[in-house]
Amino acid sequence: MAKVRTKDVMEQFNLELISGEEGINRPITMSDLSRPGIEIAGYFTYYPRERVQLLGKTELSFFEQLPEEEKKQRMDSLCTDVTPAIILSRDMPIPQELIDASEKNGVPVLRSPLKTTRLSSRLTNFLESRLAPTTAIHGVLVDIYGVGVLITGKSGVGKSETALELVKRGHRLVADDCVEIRQEDQDTLVGNAPELIEHLLEIRGLGIINVMTLFGAGAVRSNKRITIVMNLELWEQGKQYDRLGLEEETMKIIDTEITKLTIPVRPGRNLAVIIEVAAMNFRLKRMGLNAAEQFTNKLADVIEDGEQEE
């Protein structure tokens, strides 16, 4: 998991630092935010102190109604030794009690002109993206008709050559050789290329080529959600391969199950066309049109009609 510090959030959203500068390198370990309304009312039993605290108009207007002594106690309790930051929205004025408590405990107090809900949404999206679980897989990621296809297989099976043919057919390369994958949601995997090899494709006998330079900016993209895995393997004579497409194999990446197709490789098979059609067929299945199921249903009807005639 990547490290995110308060300083990163401050720079990303151009937040104004009010006080507690010594704590700007505190780590942020979770994407969940806290709006400590009930804590300002005095209930700290389940206070999530390790989260970024977000104060809006509602919390601060209630805070202003508290007696002076309670104001100091509430802010001292909000500013703990593990609280990454306290952020105020709408350019609200900062209570002096909060400034004093933040300087005392080294908790950064930041301010944003954004509305509270808008700021909360943007912060959550940023933190979920940066704190998402990550892994790296040997393969090629291509955007085919809007479907993120991760092509895997043993070294030398023809992954990069297939990707090159797909790019020539108008599809977009995301990553070759090494695909960095992060799980942004419970069932969302997003892949991208390491910065060092972004837009590059390695073809044996030809060397390294820059896809964006050769084919233009429309032939590449920086990241893509992975929807299906296509595993290329050398054809084995005695092995049984799926010929109808009724059985759906899956592959687990991090904590997400992804549909996986195994495509046997042998001379004369146009892998680029097969993968292209597989991506289109996958989209049709998700739209409720399954050719294999339609065929088996028709076959069952024909068999049933034949039995009735007998």
From Swiss-Prot:
<keyword id="KW-0460">Magnesium</keyword>
<keyword id="KW-0067">ATP-binding</keyword>
<feature type="binding site">
    <location>
        <position position="202"/>
    </location>
    <ligand>
        <name>Mg(2+)</name>
    </ligand>
</feature>
<keyword id="KW-0021">Allosteric enzyme</keyword>
<dbReference type="GO" id="GO:0000155">
    <property type="term" value="F:phosphorelay sensor kinase activity"/>
</dbReference>
<dbReference type="InterPro" id="IPR003755">
    <property type="entry name" value="HPr(Ser)_kin/Pase"/>
</dbReference>
<dbReference type="InterPro" id="IPR028979">
    <property type="entry name" value="Ser_kin/Pase_Hpr-like_N_sf"/>
</dbReference>
<dbReference type="Pfam" id="PF07475">
    <property type="entry name" value="Hpr_kinase_C"/>
</dbReference>
<keyword id="KW-0418">Kinase</keyword>
<keyword id="KW-0723">Serine/threonine-protein kinase</keyword>
<dbReference type="GO" id="GO:0006109">
    <property type="term" value="P:regulation of carbohydrate metabolic process"/>
</dbReference>
<feature type="active site" description="Proton acceptor; for phosphorylation activity. Proton donor; for dephosphorylation activity">
    <location>
        <position position="177"/>
    </location>
</feature>
<comment type="function">
    <text>Catalyzes the ATP- as well as the pyrophosphate-dependent phosphorylation of 'Ser-45' in HPr, a phosphocarrier protein of the phosphoenolpyruvate-dependent sugar phosphotransferase system (PTS). HprK/P also catalyzes the pyrophosphate-producing, inorganic phosphate-dependent dephosphorylation (phosphorolysis) of seryl-phosphorylated HPr (P-Ser-HPr).</text>
</comment>
<feature type="binding site">
    <location>
        <begin position="153"/>
        <end position="160"/>
    </location>
    <ligand>
        <name>ATP</name>
    </ligand>
</feature>
<dbReference type="InterPro" id="IPR011126">
    <property type="entry name" value="Hpr_kin/Pase_Hpr_N"/>
</dbReference>
<dbReference type="GO" id="GO:0004674">
    <property type="term" value="F:protein serine/threonine kinase activity"/>
</dbReference>
<feature type="binding site">
    <location>
        <position position="160"/>
    </location>
    <ligand>
        <name>Mg(2+)</name>
    </ligand>
</feature>
<dbReference type="GO" id="GO:0005524">
    <property type="term" value="F:ATP binding"/>
</dbReference>
<dbReference type="Pfam" id="PF02603">
    <property type="entry name" value="Hpr_kinase_N"/>
</dbReference>
<feature type="region of interest" description="Important for the catalytic mechanism of dephosphorylation">
    <location>
        <begin position="264"/>
        <end position="269"/>
    </location>
</feature>
<feature type="active site">
    <location>
        <position position="159"/>
    </location>
</feature>
<feature type="active site">
    <location>
        <position position="243"/>
    </location>
</feature>
<protein>
    <recommendedName>
        <fullName>HPr kinase/phosphorylase</fullName>
        <ecNumber>2.7.11.-</ecNumber>
        <ecNumber>2.7.4.-</ecNumber>
    </recommendedName>
</protein>
<comment type="similarity">
    <text>Belongs to the HPrK/P family.</text>
</comment>
<dbReference type="GO" id="GO:0005829">
    <property type="term" value="C:cytosol"/>
</dbReference>
<feature type="region of interest" description="Important for the catalytic mechanism of both phosphorylation and dephosphorylation">
    <location>
        <begin position="201"/>
        <end position="210"/>
    </location>
</feature>
<keyword id="KW-0547">Nucleotide-binding</keyword>
<dbReference type="InterPro" id="IPR027417">
    <property type="entry name" value="P-loop_NTPase"/>
</dbReference>
<keyword id="KW-0808">Transferase</keyword>
<dbReference type="GO" id="GO:0000287">
    <property type="term" value="F:magnesium ion binding"/>
</dbReference>
<dbReference type="GO" id="GO:0004712">
    <property type="term" value="F:protein serine/threonine/tyrosine kinase activity"/>
</dbReference>
<keyword id="KW-0479">Metal-binding</keyword>
<dbReference type="InterPro" id="IPR011104">
    <property type="entry name" value="Hpr_kin/Pase_C"/>
</dbReference>
<feature type="binding site">
    <location>
        <position position="138"/>
    </location>
    <ligand>
        <name>Mg(2+)</name>
    </ligand>
</feature>
<comment type="subunit">
    <text>Homohexamer.</text>
</comment>
<keyword id="KW-0119">Carbohydrate metabolism</keyword>
<keyword id="KW-0511">Multifunctional enzyme</keyword>
